[in-house]
């Protein structure tokens, strides 16, 4: 089974790594939504021309073929989008920070428990930054 992804928010550059690494694992993605015009949007459209922008995020959330949502919206919006995605039956991988308040975290936990969906936070710096990976190789 191929895992199909949708994207909500491309406001932070981590979306490039999030999506490309998922594609390297065999996932597909052909739709994204972002609020307004993200600073990353021009480059995103160049790097991922097959991923088309939707004007309404419900097209992504209501698509039964989409299994998982990647979220790299502005930090204050990530929790609400993750909750909306889990309530729509999707698993979620959100850019860090996954939320910005303890109230948001409590709401995410409650939604995860109620829906049984996966909520995960992408953390890649220790695996991708050359200086860090080199330090690990030499035992630092």
Can you say where each PLM-predicted feature lies in the sequence?
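Conserved beta-strand segments of alpha/beta enzyme cores
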Residues: 4, 28, 52-53, 59, ...
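Short amphipathic alpha-helical segments
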Residues: 18-20, 45, 81-84, 106, ...
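Local beta-strand N-terminus motif with an aromatic residue
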Residues: 29, 66-69, 140
């Amino acid at each position: 089974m191929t895992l199909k992804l949708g994207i909500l928010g491309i406001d932070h550059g981590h979306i490039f790594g999030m999506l490309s690494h998922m594609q390297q694992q065999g996932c597909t993605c052909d739709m994204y939504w972002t609020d307004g015009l993200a600073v990353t949007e021009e480059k995103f459209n160049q790097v991922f021309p097959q991923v088309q922008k939707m004007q309404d995020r419900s097209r992504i959330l209501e698509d039964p073929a989409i299994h998982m949502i990647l979220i790299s919206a502005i930090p204050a919006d990530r929790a609400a989008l993750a909750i909306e995605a889990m309530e729509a039956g999707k698993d979620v991988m959100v850019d860090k920070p996954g939320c910005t308040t303890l109230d948001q975290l409590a709401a995410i936990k409650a939604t995860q428990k109620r829906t049984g969906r996966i909520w995960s936070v992408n953390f890649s710096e220790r695996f991708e930054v050359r200086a860090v990976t080199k330090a690990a190789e030499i035992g630092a």
